[in-house]
Amino acid sequence: LLRRHNDVAAEVLGDAEPVVICLCTWGRPEDHAASFAEFRWARRLSFSEIVVVKPDATDGPLAVSASPALWSAGHWDDLIRDIADDRLPSVALYNPRSGEVYAPYDGGADLFLASRGRVAELRHRWSDWLSSHPEGL
């Protein structure tokens, strides 16, 4: 699990590259600040929060917490484990230089890549890792 996630993340985020780690939750940031503090990896970060209030949202406002970080393979294994164990809300890591995003979740990862060519390149490289579902799900 960790090797694949680190391989994919290193390809999308680079190595020792500045990234932005984003966590999305429903509710206000102060409702979640204490729960983030329990994670060792979160203590290394300095989160800023944005709250998006939708008047029709039944789940309350959407809180996005973001922090700059340096991505290096293996350095964030505890974050990947917490995501795989479904201990976190939605997480996305953004490389501002490339514009690409690595969004791990408990069953894999979504990638938001800079071009269709890049999608084809990585789809070919990691074809053995992809789902056999016709839509790639």
Feature locations, PLM:
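Amphipathic protein-protein interaction modules
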Residues: 68-110
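Alpha-helical oligomerization segments
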Residues: 93-137
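Extended, low-hydrophobicity segments enriched in charged/polar residues
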Residues: 1-85
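Generic surface-pattern signal
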Residues: 7-14, 85-88, 124-131, 135
